[in-house]
């Protein structure tokens, strides 16, 4: 990958965010998702590359998707693998709530974890705690370690957990330590990445979410030097979701085996989920969130707010882009 390709990858998430934002607040979850998917696919098709989707959203709940194994790009140029979520937080977008964004991770061929659209147990933490907290330890142990690594009292820590029935025991354990919980309804990528930046007020992400977002988060956290671990969840009894009502543990294990995953219980480090020499994360806000603003529509332009994190040059670029409309007369500075 080079800087020209990374710039085009930024434009991919910008276009997906704009397409989805046009349906924000209309209660049309699937339509917003489909619009983002098609915009992302169209812009990827204009890039001179041999692109491939290795993990994406949609397989779990039959949403529109860029499917696993789909080839994107012009068909010539460098080989690039993608993990994508064109509309992260579809419910958030549908009801114009904070935290929805278009996101992806990209790497050279073979550089991203290839898995079905399953669930994943995740642990994200700041760089100071990297290699010290561990997903195999209890929440209580990890919170104590976090407190020591960050120099904060336990009751000063904020732990983000998705508000799901499957997390009832986890939430109770965290509260018993005295740490503070920030429950989120959807979209854990921003929470994971926020752990990699100082001053966000987010100190840890714990719990089970979607696997594609886990790979995307891992790519960002690897470039940031933060801690991220993931472990696939294949048992419907653990996932506790209606989306898996017709799925079985045995069937899910067979699906993993088909994709070459011989150790379904393996704990993956960020460097294994995003193992390529060059890895980048790109995200663009659909609605306002912790890391960036949502899409803003004006008479003469559309404004997007985005973030690109890359280990190619060890940079984090916060980008505000003005997309000028045809026939524009006057563009405000901000």
UniProtKB/Swiss-Prot annotation:
One of its GO terms (molecular function) is fructose 1,6-bisphosphate 1-phosphatase activity. It catalyses: beta-D-fructose 1,6-bisphosphate + H2O = beta-D-fructose 6-phosphate + phosphate; D-sedoheptulose 1,7-bisphosphate + H2O = D-sedoheptulose 7-phosphate + phosphate. Its EC number is 3.1.3.11, 3.1.3.37. One of its GO terms (cellular component) is cytosol. Mn(2+) 2 binds at residues 85, 88, 213. Substrate binds at residues 88-90, 119, 164-166, 186-188. Its cofactor is Mn(2+). This is D-fructose 1,6-bisphosphatase class 2/sedoheptulose 1,7-bisphosphatase.
């Amino acid at each position: 990958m080079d800087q020209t390709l990374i710039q085009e990858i930024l434009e991919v998430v910008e276009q997906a965010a704009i397409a989805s934002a046009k349906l924000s607040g209309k209660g049309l979850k699937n339509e917003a998702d489909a619009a983002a998917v098609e915009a992302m696919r169209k812009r990827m098709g204009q890039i001179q590359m041999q692109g491939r989707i290795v993990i994406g959203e949609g397989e779990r709940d039959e949403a529109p998707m860029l499917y696993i194994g789909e080839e994107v790009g012009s068909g010539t140029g460098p080989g690039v693998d993608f993990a994508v979520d064109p509309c992260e937080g579809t419910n958030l977008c549908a009801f114009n709530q904070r935290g929805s964004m278009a996101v992806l991770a990209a790497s050279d061929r073979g550089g991203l974890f290839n898995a079905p659209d399953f669930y994943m147990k995740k642990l994200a933490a700041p760089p100071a705690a990297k290699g010290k907290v561990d997903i195999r330890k209890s929440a209580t142990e990890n919170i104590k370690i976090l407190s020591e690594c960050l120099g904060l009292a336990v009751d000063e820590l904020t732990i983000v957990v998705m508000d799901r029935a499957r997390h009832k025991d986890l939430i109770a354990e965290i509260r018993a330590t005295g740490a503070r919980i920030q429950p989120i309804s959807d979209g854990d990528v921003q929470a994971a990445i926020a752990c990699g930046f100082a001053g966000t007020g987010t100190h840890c992400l714990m719990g089970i979410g979607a696997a594609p977002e886990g790979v995307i988060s891992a790519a960002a956290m690897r470039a940031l030097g933060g801690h991220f671990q993931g472990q696939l969840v294949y048992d419907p009894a653990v996932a506790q979701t209606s989306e898996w009502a017709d799925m079985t543990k045995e069937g899910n294990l067979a699906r993993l085996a088909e994709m070459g995953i011989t150790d379904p219980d393996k704990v993956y480090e960020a460097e294994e989920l995003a193992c390529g020499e060059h890895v980048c994360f790109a995200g663009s806000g659909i609605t306002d969130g912790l890391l960036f603003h949502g899409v803003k529509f004006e008479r003469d332009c559309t404004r997007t707010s985005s973030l690109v994190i890359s280990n190619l040059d060890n940079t984090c670029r916060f980008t505000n882009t003005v997309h000028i409309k045809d026939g524009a007369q006057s563009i405000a500075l901000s």
